């Protein structure tokens, strides 16, 4: 695993079997390929990463990733969330890493340009501890549902708040609303700090762990993207939506 030792920009795809909403989700088939394989192959197309690896504590997922030719690392079962799984892999296997991208395994339609944009934004903003992506939306369902996280940020691209509520509230002046895309780029040193930040009142209220960063006064910058992602997979019925989306993309390319 020479790439592990020398990689400076690393993409980690945490993958777990026991999703309460969709057990076994990583191995669900989408037009003949599993969710984890599609997510992994998308990440491999990034121009900015030196190495991409799946991190899992499940032998079935590990065996499958190895079978399709991907890189995979087994992690401990004590990780409380995907970010802790990412940090464990980086601290153990990537001594030279400088930038770490946490790639969500439920975004099979994520464009690799999103990953490249995250890395570029982090490199170009020395004050940023971490970077995440957002995209503008006018979809009323996405705006109103608490399953989609919204974000507001300042003129310099620094996040002010994340919420499951519709923010900002357009009471008197129409303002763009941005949906959060759950992909993060960290400086390695800050990632080690991040996993040690205790839950905060706002992070518990919203059930959004990134709010811990804002509550202690650290900075999250945002990278605004357009048309760079499709439907995500949260429930079994989302598989059909993703397949329809991919088929439409395939037809449009001809």
UniProtKB/Swiss-Prot annotation:
It comes from the Bacteria. One of its GO terms (biological process) is CMP-keto-3-deoxy-D-manno-octulosonic acid biosynthetic process. It catalyses: 3-deoxy-alpha-D-manno-oct-2-ulosonate + CTP = CMP-3-deoxy-beta-D-manno-octulosonate + diphosphate. Pfam families: CTP_transf_3. GO terms for cellular component: cytosol. Pathway: Nucleotide-sugar biosynthesis; CMP-3-deoxy-D-manno-octulosonate biosynthesis; CMP-3-deoxy-D-manno-octulosonate from 3-deoxy-D-manno-octulosonate and CTP: step 1/1; Bacterial outer membrane biogenesis; lipopolysaccharide biosynthesis. Signal peptide: none annotated. It is found in: Cytoplasm. InterPro entries: Cytidylyl_trans, KdsB, Nucleotide-diphossugar_trans. SUPFAM superfamilies: Nucleotide-diphospho-sugar transferases. Its EC number is 2.7.7.38. Activates KDO (a required 8-carbon sugar) for incorporation into bacterial lipopolysaccharide in Gram-negative bacteria. This is 3-deoxy-manno-octulosonate cytidylyltransferase. It comes from Chlamydia trachomatis serovar D (strain ATCC VR-885 / DSM 19411 / UW-3/Cx). The gene is kdsB.
